[in-house]
Every structure is written in structure tokens, then in C-alpha cells.
């Protein structure tokens, strides 16, 4: 009888791995089916029920904008939130996650205007326009909700918060009123970022910096009493008509030159080099001697008062700053000190208005009236004549409107502000002081977020919260027509909020003052008028802590939230607006920790754009790879910096996914007949070794996950799976798993170790690869399921503390040295399999293992301390101990293929015993 035939005969006697868990995930096809099941099973509600009475974790969702489809940055954000929520859930905590959407604001209003046309918009009733905006937002809420669910994100999708819901609008308004009650809401004329393309004021968070070419000019203002001209420098010639002052630095020296110019002494050499001036220094001037004197604006002959200000720097320019209080924050502040006129000759569309005629700001006003200010630059330079000493066009970073991407202007208008530097509340501190104190006590992931937020809070101006648009929550106050005073009566404000809650804030536009006014106010509706501005959308989103976490309108978790998590741009956006609104209204911080992630970029680290063709769309990734690969990409990325994504990177994550899936499949298949996990004390040295390794690694993974360093944890997991588990342990266990008796303690011990590791792998990866771990449980034997219906019933698995008696260094070194000899023998065709070999050693670390363990470690037929008489095929030493490799002298067992049979074509004693 041939051996081949015997092998075929004995194959049925082997305990080969058994599982129906597929090798391939077929994720794009199978995930949607699974997500549909989760929806039908209401797993979010199930998760709530499973953790009743447990410690809670609340991650408050920052609202994406309800306009357009989601992009890869949205996917990153929502997946990271989902992983963190599920991590805490599988750690045994009760989680709440109410998703939300930002529904008001300019982009939606612009989309509606594009659809109906600007002319129709002008004649459309405001409430009708607002309804069209509401419909547009609702459409994209539904679209984005579906897209987010496809990412495997579990949330309270049936009860999201929408900033346009009536109750929500009412609570935004209540937050505004609470801030007014604290005395921090002020209305004044002040320069603000102004988008002339969108005809509205902008907050700091709505300003983006882009490159722009501007004329850099030096202009001579002749002093009224000194025979010299002061040279100012500016890159905004269009603001020169509104100039009412020239700022000098009172702590610096100035000089007069032989060509009759006055400049800062520190900048004299630079001005000579740049050929702005040519003369030598003839006199040193104390700037305080020039204070409150006048120079003459060469553009219109109007006086320009010389003032002293700390904002005048000596790093560029001339040391004399052109000052137009209507066009700049510093200009405005210094203007208040010196009583400079605030002239604003520019209308909402960025064009010169009738002010230039009334104030005689140009010699020939007709050619400037109605002209866009940026188009006026060249005309102004021409009109300056000899007073223009130098012009150079420069490319520099300039503020642009975040929505229209047009350069903005500073424009003094009457706006509503939240004061940052007025004292208020119990502690009588400013909002800035309170915010900075809070930041010191928050937890930041990563830590550098603290300094970034602090720097922005330290340098920020008052918060301009008013907008001159239609789609938003109105700043709904009544103003006395005669006195111009705002009615801040609490009952009047509460009544307005009640109407908003019942009818929405469209009521402000649809109802008469007599209907909106609290009946018992004692005020005459005829004496009142409505304010017309709406709130900045950042105020909307900043109010979510009140409208969602504190209103009891949502089952949204605890206040303050445990975590806010958004992109790093939100240090100047939502993190700030949430902090400032909450502190201003109730002097409490809205969150305990802040986690920020970077932006998504392509493989080369470049920003994604349609023109470059490097955009990675989430729906394309889902169709090609599945959401599990996208989730693994998020978890494997260092989110603290920008995250690279490309087809190549996704393929790498697919490979990692396959490793995890196939390792899990192997574990599943080999514990299919295990009925009970044996105690650790009955396990062999190799089983204890791998459990000890697993315990250490999974503890490190858990610590990394608790610090939200998922990539660090997954790299440790990958290394363990590849090197220790698949690379060594699973390989060395195959003989006992397949060939030992079903009830042999060696086999049961290995199965038990594998079952414990499999359970830990499932609970560890459940937050990240939720679909795959749920699928795995479907096919898992009861020993792994623990009576769970699905992954959401799964509880945290804690591996036992195991002491390994193995000297890992010796075993691994010996295995590596033996591997080198084995490879050489295979290459020279001396052997086909390592089972043809036996090893002699006098190493007590190796001999301490029993015969089965030691031979399995090297995958040879035998390890002995008896010297052999045959030829040595190779040898090495570890710690002075000898290892010699020989050909096995026994015969090949036709069942296990080990060379341990006494006679040819007969079973070895182990296999013979098993088959009995």
C-alpha cells in the first residue's frame, strides 16, 4: 500500500479546522444587509437598555452643515466619534449619542437664491424664502443621515437635533436672552469683517486666509506746521479716503531727513534700501512732540490727527500707520482714545456710497460713487500724484469670506456683540478670563490643543453675532422708536421664546408686534419696532449644549459633556462658540475634554480638490472596499496630524483587515468543538507563554485606546497577531490540534488559550470592526458567544493573569538560529519538511518543556538531550549551550507525518493510541 493512499485513509481521522465563517468579507455587498438588520433591531435602543445604571459617557456631536453630500472629512469625523463611543460602550459604560445638523446660514440661503433667482428672492415674502431654506436643509439632513449610517455609525438617528426645529430655535433665543441678562450683549458701531459679496458681517471663524495681490504703497502726508511730510505705508489704498489719523509709536525715535520726510529711526535704513527716501538724517524727533498735531491727507486735503499707539510695529513699513477707525480694529480702538471721526464711506456691497460726496472724501467724487473699493485702488494711486512715493505689488495672505471666497473688508456698522472684556457674574470676571481659566482645567487630545485654544482666546476681539441675512434665528428684540432703547423685560423675552417654540421663529416675520408682545407688558405696540438682524450660525451651534444637553428635549446624556470631538479648525469655531455661549449665559464649561483631528489629504500630503483629481469620495470607498476598511483607515491613522488617504493606503488597510479576519477565522475554526475552557494551571508552558504575551499586549492596547491612540494600539495588535500568534503559536499548535485526541489535555489547553485570545480580540476590535465582529459571532461556537445574540450583547473580556516559566529570549533565539539552518537545508534540497529533523540540545530552558512542547516549538519530530550517531546537518550555540540538527532516524507516520514511527508505513505510538 502506498503512503499517499494511507494519507487519504487517515485524513478523516484528523481534527481539521471547521467553520462556515467566510474567508472573504465581501464587505460592499454584505455590510448594507447587516446595517439594515441593526436598524430593524434598534441596536441603539438595545445598547441603552444593556447599560442601564452604568457609568455614563457623553460625546456631544458637533453639527455638520445640512448642505451637500458628505465628504471624506465628514466620514473621518463620524467614524472616530463612533469608535470612541463604542469603545466606552464595550468597556461597560452607558453611552448617549444624539447626532445633529446645522441648518441655518448663508450657504443654504445662497443655494435657494440660485434655484429661484435673485430677482424673485427680492419680492418673495421672508417666511416663504425661509420655508424654501428649511426644505433644502431637511432634504440634505436625510441624505447625510443615510450616508453616515452606511459608515456603520450607531446613533439616535430617529431623534437627531436640527437647529431649525421650533424648540431648538426657541432655546437658541433663550440662550441669547440669558447672555443679555448677564449684561454681555451690546450693540454698537464697530469695524467688523464684512463680506461684500454676501452682504453680511462675519465672525472670526467665518474668515479664511488666501493669497491675494495688493499694492504696497508709501504715501507722504504733509505736516501742517513742520516743513516735512510723514510717510505712511498701507496695502489698502481704498481705505485712504476714510483716514482720520496717523499712528506713531510713542516709545520709538523718529527722524527727519534732508529730503523732508519723517520716518521711524529703526526703519530708516530699510526705506533707503527700498528707495522710498534718499535724504540723510538731519534731526531726531520725539513722537510725543507730534501728538495731536495734524498732517494733510493728499487725497482730499482733510486733516489727519497724529496719535500714539502701541500697535505700531517696527518690523516693516515706515513707523507711521495710516489710521481709518471705520476700517480696522486697532484703528477703531486708538480712535476711541483720541476721539477720531469714524467715517464709513462703503456700503454693504463694497461700493463707495453718498458719504464720499457728503464728507468730500475725493476731489472728484463722481468717478468713485458706486465703484467697488478694490477696483478703486488704481484710480486712487493715480490721484495721489507726487504724494505716492513708492508702489510695489505684493502677494500676501489676506482674509477672505469662507463661503464666497472673495476678499473681505473691515467695515464699521451697527452690530450686536458679546463682550469679551466686560466683567460679569458671581466672580465679577470677564468672559475672556473665565474662558482662559476653564481651558487650564480641561483635558486635551492632543495636549497642544490647549495652547492653541488659549492663544485664540487671548487674541480674539468681541464676538460679532449679528448677520444681515434672512435664514437664521432672528435677534428678536423690540426697540423703542423714540428712545432707540431695546426692551429687555424678562416676561417679554420669555413670551417671544414661547411663541418661537410653538410656531418657529418665522413668527417674528409673520406676526404683528401686537401679537408678539407679552400682553401684560404695559408697552404700546405702536411705540415699538422689530430688530431685523439674525444670529451668526456659530451662535446656533454654540447653543447646542443648552438646546440638546440641558433642555430635556433629547435623551442626549450628561452635562457637561465628557467630550467634544472635531477637526482642528474648530479651535476657532465650535469649541470657542460653545465655550463662550455657555460661560456667558451660565458660567459653566460645556465640556470636560476636547479631542481634535487633522484634515484629510492625499498620499502626497496635498489638499484634495476636484481640479487636482485627488478627491477620495466616501461612497466610492464603500462601493470598492466597504466601510470596515474606511473605519480601519481612521483607526490606523495618527489623527493628531493630517490624515493621508489614497487607493494605495486603502489597499494597505485591506491587507491588514485580511490578516485580522483570517486570524480570527483560524481561531474560530480550531475551537469549534471546544466545550469548556480549561484552567490555566492545566495548560502547558507554550499556552501560558502566549497567554502571558496576549495579556501584556492587550493591556497595552487598552491603555492606548483609553488615551484615544488607536493607531498605537492597533500597531501593537498587528505585531502580536503576525509575530507571536500566527507566526509562532498557531503554527506550533497545529500538530496537537489536528492529530491529538479530541480530549487530550495538550489540545484542550491550546484550544482554551486560543478561545480566550479570540474572545479578547472580538471585544477589542468590536468598536472598530463592528460589522466583522458581529458577523464572526454569527458563526462562532457557543464557547465564544457567551449566550450573546449579537456583538452589542458582548461584554468586555479580561484575560487571566498568567506567569510564563519560559525564557522567551532563549526560545526565540534558538528558533531563529534553527530557521536559518532549515532554510539552508531546504534550499539545498536536503529536506522537504522540518519534520524530517530532530534537534539535540543540552539547554535546560528547552529541555524544561515536555517532549511535545519542545518538538512543536521547532516544528521538528523530536528534541532530545541524547547525542546522535548520524551526521550533524547544522549546529549553533545559545548562551553557551549546544544545539545540533540531525536527520530523524525513525520512520514517517502516515497520519501526523512526524518521523516517529518505529516501522515504515505504520502509525507512531501517539496516532495509534488516538485511533484506538
Label every PLM stretch briefly:
Residues 195, 401, 480, 518-524, ...:
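Short cysteine-rich clusters marking metal-coordination/redox-active sites
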Residues 651, 779-916:
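C-terminal low-complexity, glycine/proline- and small-hydrophobic-enriched intrinsically disordered tails
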Residues 210, 323-326, 526-535, 555, ...:
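Conserved phosphate-binding loops in nucleotide/dinucleotide-binding enzymes
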Residues 148, 171, 463, 655-668, ...:
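Core structural elements
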Amino acid at each position: 500500500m502506498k503512503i499517499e493512499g494511507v494519507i487519504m485513509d487517515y485524513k478523516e481521522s484528523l481534527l481539521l479546522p471547521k467553520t462556515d465563517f467566510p474567508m472573504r468579507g465581501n464587505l460592499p455587498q454584505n455590510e448594507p444587509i447587516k446595517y439594515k438588520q441593526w436598524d430593524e433591531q434598534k441596536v441603539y435602543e438595545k445598547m441603552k437598555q444593556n447599560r442601564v445604571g452604568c457609568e455614563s459617557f457623553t460625546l456631544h456631536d458637533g453639527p455638520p452643515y445640512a448642505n451637500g453630500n458628505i465628504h471624506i472629512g465628514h466620514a473621518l469625523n463620524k467614524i472616530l466619534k463612533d469608535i470612541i463611543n463604542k469603545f466606552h460602550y464595550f468597556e461597560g459604560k452607558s453611552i448617549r449619542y444624539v447626532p445633529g445638523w446645522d441648518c441655518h446660514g448663508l450657504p443654504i440661503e445662497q443655494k435657494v437664491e440660485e434655484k429661484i433667482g435673485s430677482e424673485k428672492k427680492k419680492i418673495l415674502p421672508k417666511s416663504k424664502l425661509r420655508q424654501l431654506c428649511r426644505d433644502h436643509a431637511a432634504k440634505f439632513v436625510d441624505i447625510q443621515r443615510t450616508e453616515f449610517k452606511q459608515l456603520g455609525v450607531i446613533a439616535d438617528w430617529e431623534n437627531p437635533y436640527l437647529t431649525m426645529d421650533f424648540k431648538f430655535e426657541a432655546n437658541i433665543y433663550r440662550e441669547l436672552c440669558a447672555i443679555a441678562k448677564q449684561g454681555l450683549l451690546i450693540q454698537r458701531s464697530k469695524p467688523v469683517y464684512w463680506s461684500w459679496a454676501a452682504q453680511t458681517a462675519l465672525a472670526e471663524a467665518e474668515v479664511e486666509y488666501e493669497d491675494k495681490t495688493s499694492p504696497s504703497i508709501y504715501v507722504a502726508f504733509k505736516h501742517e506746521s513742520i516743513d516735512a511730510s510723514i510717510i505712511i505705508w498701507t496695502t489698502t489704498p481704498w481705505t485712504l479716503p476714510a483716514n482720520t489719523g496717523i499712528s506713531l509709536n510713542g516709545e520709538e525715535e523718529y527722524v527727519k531727513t534732508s529730503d523732508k520726510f519723517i520716518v521711524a529711526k529703526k526703519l530708516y535704513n530699510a526705506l533707503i534700501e527700498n528707495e522710498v527716501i534718499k535724504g540723510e538724517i538731519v534731526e531726531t524727533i520725539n513722537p510725543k512732540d507730534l501728538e495731536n498735531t495734524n498732517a494733510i491727507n493728499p487725497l482730499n486735503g482733510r486733516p489727519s490727527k497724529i496719535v500714539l499707539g502701541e500697535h505700531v510695529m517696527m518690523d516693516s513699513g515706515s513707523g507711521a500707520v495710516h489710521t481709518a477707525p471705520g476700517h480696522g480694529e486697532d484703528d477703531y480702538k486708538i480712535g476711541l482714545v483720541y476721539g477720531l471721526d469714524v467715517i464709513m464711506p462703503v456700503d454693504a456691497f463694497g461700493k463707495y456710497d453718498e458719504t464720499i460726496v457728503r464728507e468730500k472724501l475725493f476731489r472728484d467724487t463722481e468717478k468713485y460713487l458706486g465703484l467697488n473699493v478694490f477696483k478703486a485702488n488704481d484710480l486712487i494711486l493715480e490721484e495721489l500724484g507726487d504724494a505716492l512715493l513708492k508702489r510695489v505689488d505684493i502677494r500676501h495672505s489676506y482674509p477672505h469670506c469662507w463661503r464666497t471666497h472673495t476678499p473681505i473688508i473691515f467695515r464699521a456698522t451697527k452690530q450686536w456683540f458679546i463682550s469679551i472684556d466686560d466683567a460679569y457674574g458671581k466672580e465679577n470676571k470677564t468672559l475672556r478670563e473665565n474662558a482662559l481659566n476653564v481651558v487650564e482645567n480641561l483635558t486635551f487630545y492632543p495636549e497642544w490643543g490647549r495652547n492653541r485654544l488659549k492663544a485664540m482666546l487671548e487674541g480674539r476681539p468681541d464676538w460679532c453675532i449679528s448677520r444681515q441675512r434672512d435664514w437664521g434665528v432672528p435677534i428678536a428684540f423690540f426697540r423703542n422708536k423714540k428712545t432707540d432703547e431695546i426692551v429687555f423685560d424678562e416676561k417679554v423675552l420669555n413670551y417671544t421664546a414661547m411663541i418661537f417654540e410653538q410656531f418657529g421663529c418665522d413668527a417674528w416675520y409673520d406676526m404683528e408686534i401686537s401679537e408678539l408682545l407679552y400682553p401684560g407688558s404695559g408697552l404700546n405696540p405702536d411705540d415699538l419696532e422689530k430688530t431685523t438682524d439674525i444670529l451668526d450660525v456659530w451662535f446656533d451651534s454654540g447653543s447646542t449644549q443648552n438646546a440638546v444637553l440641558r433642555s430635556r428635549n433629547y435623551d442626549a446624556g450628561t452635562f457637561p459633556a465628557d467630550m467634544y470631538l472635531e477637526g482642528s479648525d474648530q479651535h476657532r469655531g465650535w469649541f470657542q462658540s460653545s465655550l463662550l455661549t455657555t460661560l456667558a449665559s451660565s458660567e459653566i464649561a460645556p465640556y470636560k475634554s476636547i479631542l481634535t483631528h487633522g484634515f484629510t489629504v492625499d498620499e502626497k500630503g496635498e489638499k484634495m480638490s476636484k481640479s487636482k483629481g485627488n478627491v477620495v469620495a466616501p461612497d466610492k470607498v464603500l462601493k470598492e472596499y466597504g466601510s470596515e476598511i474606511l473605519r480601519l483607515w481612521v483607526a490606523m491613522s495618527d489623527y493628531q496630524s493630517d490624515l493621508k488617504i489614497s487607493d494605495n493606503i486603502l489597499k494597505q488597510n485591506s491587507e491588514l483587515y485580511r490578516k485580522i479576519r483570517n486570524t480570527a477565522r483560524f481561531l474560530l475554526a480550531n475551537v469549534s468543538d471546544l466545550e469548556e475552557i480549561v484552567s490555566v494551571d492545566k495548560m502547558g508552558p507554550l499556552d501560558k507563554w502566549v497567554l502571558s504575551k496576549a495579556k501584556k499586549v492587550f493591556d497595552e492596547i487598552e491603555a492606548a485606546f483609553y488615551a484615544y491612540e488607536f493607531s498605537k494600539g492597533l500597531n501593537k495588535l498587528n505585531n502580536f497577531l503576525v509575530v507571536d500568534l500566527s507566526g509562532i503559536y498557531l503554527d506550533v499548535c497545529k500538530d496537537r490540534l489536528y492529530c491529538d485526541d479530541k480530549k487530550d489535555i495538550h489540545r484542550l489547553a491550546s484550544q482554551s488559550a486560543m478561545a480566550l485570545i479570540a474572545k479578547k480580540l472580538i471585544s477589542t476590535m468590536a468598536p472598530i470592526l463592528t460589522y466583522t465582529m458581529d458577523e464572526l459571532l454569527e458563526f462562532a461556537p457557543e464557547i465564544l458567544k457567551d449566550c450573546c445574540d449579537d456583538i452589542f450583547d458582548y461584554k468586555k473580556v479580561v484575560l487571566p493573569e498568567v506567569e510564563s516559566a519560559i525564557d522567551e529570549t532563549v526560545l526565540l533565539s534558538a528558533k531563529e538560529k534553527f530557521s536559518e539552518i532549515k532554510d539552508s537545508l531546504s534550499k539545498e534540497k536536503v529536506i522537504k519538511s522540518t519534520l524530517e529533523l530532530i534537534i539535540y540540545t543540552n539547554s535546560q530552558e528547552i529541555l524544561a518543556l515536555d517532549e511535545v512542547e519542545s518538538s512543536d516549538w521547532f516544528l521538528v519530530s523530536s528534541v532530545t538531550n541524547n547525542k546522535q550517531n548520524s551526521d550533524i546537518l547544522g549546529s549553533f550555540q545559545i548562551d553557551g549551550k549546544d544545539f545540533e540538527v540531525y536527520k530523524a532516524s525513525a520512520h514517517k507516520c502516515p497520519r501526523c507525518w512526524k518521523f516517529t514511527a518505529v516501522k515504515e508505513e505504520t502509525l507512531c505510538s501517539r496516532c495509534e493510541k488516538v485511533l484506538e
